[in-house]
Amino acid sequence: MSDDNNSNNMSNNNNNNNNNNNNNNNNNNNNNNNNNNNSNNNNSNNNNENNNNKSFQIQPILIQISEILQQSIELKLCSSVNTHNVFWDTLLYNLELNGDAISMIISLLLTKYILLLNNENNQYSLLQALFTKLTNASVEEFNDLLNGNNSNNNSNNNNNNNNNNNNNNNNNNNNNNNNNNNNNNNNNNNNNNNNNNNNNNNNSNGNNINTSNGNEDDVEQQTESTEQDFTSTSQNSTPSISRLASKLSQTDLDSFNLSISETNLTGVNYSSVSPQQSSPPLISTSSTGSLSNDYININNNNNSNSNININTSGTNDSDSTTTFSINGINMSSEEIKESETIRLSILSTIGYLSLFHKFNPQFPTLKVIIHKLGEIQLEKSRFEYSLHNEVLRILQTNNQDNNDFLFFLIDQCSDQNSSNLDNLKLNNNINKINSWYNPSIRKILREESVSKSKAVFEHLLLFLKHPLLSEKRVLFLLQMLKHYLLVIPVLSSLTIQSALSIVKTYYLWPKPYGCFAKEILEILSLELKSPGSYFRNILAREFPSIMSSPNSIGSASLTNTLFTNKNRPTIHFLVDKYNSEALLIQELFEANYNTYTPSITQLQSNNIENIYKRILGIDNSQLGIEFLEPIDVSTIHFKILDVMNKTMYLEENESKSIRIKELISIRDEIIKFCNLSTNSNSNLNSTTTTATTTNILKHVPKNIELPNLNYQFISMLTLSVRHKRPDQFGTPFYIPINRKSTTSLIDLLSNYQDQDFHNQVKFAIIGNDTSVQHILASYLFLKYQQPELFHSLDIMFYIIPTGTSNCKIAELISSFDPWYTNQVRQCLVSLYSIIPSFPPISKLSKIERQSFIESISQIKDLRNSIALKENELEQQQQQQPQQPQQQNSDVASIILNEQQQQQQQQQSNLNNSNNEIKNDINSSTTAATTTTTTTTTTTTTTIHKDNPVETPSHTIQTEIEYLFREASFSLEIPVLKCEGWGIDDNNYFTIPFLMKAEMNTSTFLAGFSDLISSDPTQINKLMGKYSPMNVNIKILQCNQMGVPLQWINIDNKTFYDIEINNIMPKSISHPTIQSTSSPSTSSSNNNNSTTTATNNNGNNGNNNNGNGNNNNNNNNNNNNNNNNNNNNNNGPATISSSLKKSIIQSKPKMQLVLIEAEQKKKKVKSSEDTFKFTINAIEMESIDKKKSFDILLDGQLHGPFNKIKISFCSSNISNIINNAAKNSSSSNSSNYSIGFNDLQDNDFITFPIMSFLPLV
């Protein structure tokens, strides 16, 4: 027995008479006194539980997690990517590898989701709600556990009376206090009296607590050795606090589970509760108030969903309101929308945590709350029905060691029904979790588990062998196979051979399946000959400095940032400055770029270890790469790559033997280098030794991973011709442009022209349709104004659509590429559905935003001081301030060592002259002295970058980056132009666009967008004012191959709807693996396989038109190509491109859709009055020259115009356009027949895509 028990026994022996009198008084008390005694009895039981058994007390870490989640869900504090990263870094700090802690976080989120689903007005924290939901107890009892004592004044008096032996004074103060003392001294007698006199409702809760007290001794034996009183203000745990946060949280969570299981023995097994139970167990209404009734209703309604009803009146277009009734409580439409948004964010967050972090499925708290969630049966019409079931399935089956779960991930990732474009349009908030499956599989593969990697590829190949596999899913699965070959660290040769045999079956399929299978077969054959070659080729292309010869560089260059980024390919982000969501995506890439960029030495170390794992099956424990100097690592890496490249083209058996022999000899050299470095360190003084050890530990080998790409962000100022006159009109097309945006593109392209080799230029447009149209205008203006800027450049455009804005060009790409739909569009949108809430426009002030960040930072600092051991804290405090001083004090010795190493290496190279040796030594010493300061700063930052918490924003950025790496197909879209004249003929300019032009009700309503956004009810009133246009139309009709046939005039007609759609050609670019061969060999391969699109277009034009004096040179080239297709290559200069050009089977064409309207009623006549034409050009002019009209071009409003012309934009007809600008009446049918549709490759805009879905 403890000291507290002894003191209580003494007080019991001294006050027997008082106890008997008080017991008699208890029997004669009225109902009010009985209620008071009952509450005091419960308080005394809690007090004895705390004093006698040292019961569970909630640790600060668990409380902090609850507070962080509560703030992030309800207060909507997130306003930037940095704040988002701070939240996740704080939440998962030192808890990433703790499965029980992740399970607890998921349990808290599920609790909040159930509260919102049942429309409960919870005024307490998530931890309180979870406790009351699991135990059917009151919140006050939770506060007793939280505080370690009673919460009212009577409990404080009881504690004082138990600690003091002066019972006479306590009897004189108050009779109620004396009765409470008697209850504390005689628990058994008082409990019997209370059972006879008090109500059953109050006794039910008291009996549950007494049962827990009876079993508390068993809990003490399990947790007393590991549990400590751990608060933010305690200072008594200096020697015993030397445990990691995972240990602390483990003890915390185990104690929480034990307290729940012991406190609520009957409530854990929810299956034992009958669904037809008339009255659930009640709790004390005096302690919980009205909130307890809500919990009672929840427990009674969890088994059935009959009380959750959705009542709608009318249709969505009507003005009637929608009522949502849950448990008899009606909600407004705004409250419904807010609740749905929060529930969606909670489910998405749970899905992210369960897929990217290992949790304990057997965690008692999680098992109970999942069981309660499974009892809720949602209707299929509910907002989150599909996501609810999907998250529940993940939580019930998540076990990454189980093959069934890996099969589930591959099945869900390749499921194209969930990522259907129609579903994405109808409900933009569903199925956002599907974009997380592929990163989750990639994370499993990077764990370097041979069994898991083998299981993933076996399941993937099993899908590809299925005879009933749809064609759409085949392309997605092939792309998954290609993607996993890039990221997997180790892959057995047997798996590669089985993949070769399966992919060969798709080689004979038509395009694009056969082309894609050929590319994958090339990758697999290279992997079989030289394991890891695909990864090393991509790494060398993105990081050219990693392949530099060690003879041409010094040790100081390896730590130089300029040398690291030398010749790295750059992704140029064209960001819409006036789009807040575009700026958010820019911040997403900028915030995660510097954090996850390793050094050259680190990449080389990772590569060396991975090659030894693939070939010899040994890791760094048998190598010791961390003991090598950076220059030695570079030398070893260069030798190993030389061996791998030389043995690639030998026979399989011979290459394996030579490769193993050479790698063993290089391993012996590594050991020698390690011995030399250790001997040299032993000869140095103590300060120098500590400095060298800190340098050695910087490049410990890690799992292979491609670093972030190199980015450049260029602000583009979007322009509205309708509201603001442009800075300049580009001649001869009079394209409206912005001078600053155009100047930025000129500077960027000029830098590429200064280089001596051909390049790919990758532009990533971040924005919506307005951004695309603005950049397209500047791009075309430069192509016609300064064509020398595009010489020998392969221009590619990537579309990164903003989260909530409409982007029609992104929808078009999604219709061709399911990977783009799933892993780019949905992945970006998922950022808005993960807590903390991420509104496009923050409603918080900067002061509130900063206070939130500071509060979370303080919590993280507290957990940091709690989590780390005292020894580790002292080491960090000593090393961090001393490390720069040690390096600065030993600059001279470090430089001398570098000079000696370089001289030894340079003497072995007989081909180098003495002058070059001296120059190298001087350059290395000067570089070392100038970069010593920068080196010390990077070492202090790399300590924080060793194991950063992977946030959702970093996962999204990484997933989008693979679009820039692996897109081997290309969607080539011909550019359209709309020439418009106002009422005054001098008001002329040209608007380029890509997809669609329309004149209908959408065009009319677009002019009142501001009014509709402020008051949506004005749509019906505005529709009554719509008046169809009466126009004259002239079209150039063509056949299905795009060959012009004849001109057709349609005079004086009124059309309700006019649409012009750009029809995509039914062929795409041929995919091929990026090779390291010279440009000449790649161009010759192009000639042997395919011809260019320009040549075929020219031939068709010559066969049909027969005239065209302006294109004689092109005709001659085309005739030569007909005779010798294998010898000539007169296409565009895209030699360095990895996207080979294929034969375009048909010329570009447009589809015209006309819907005639009654002139008097202004309505559509019938469905029979819809006319469709395949055309090459169209002219429209208003009959009344005083009336003007507007037009929508790719969703952007332009006008007003009196006359327009729409045709394809070709460089061969610039003179005609220039003449048309001067005189609008000079254009006729003969002018359009000259060189019409004679497009070159540079007249197409190339959009690289991952997989191509053929047009039906």
UniProtKB/Swiss-Prot annotation:
GO terms for biological process: G protein-coupled receptor signaling pathway. Residues 147-214, 898-916, 925-942, 1080-1136 have a biased composition (Low complexity). GO terms for cellular component: phosphatidylinositol 3-kinase complex; phosphatidylinositol 3-kinase complex, class IB. One of its GO terms (molecular function) is 1-phosphatidylinositol-3-kinase regulator activity. Residues 222-243, 1069-1079 have a biased composition (Polar residues). Coiled coil: none annotated. Signal peptide: none annotated. Residues 1-53, 145-243, 898-951, 1069-1136 are annotated as: Disordered. PANTHER family: PHOSPHATIDYLINOSITOL 3-KINASE REGULATORY SUBUNIT (PTHR15593), PROTEIN DDB_G0292252-RELATED (PTHR15593:SF3). This is Putative protein DDB_G0292252. It comes from Dictyostelium discoideum (Social amoeba).
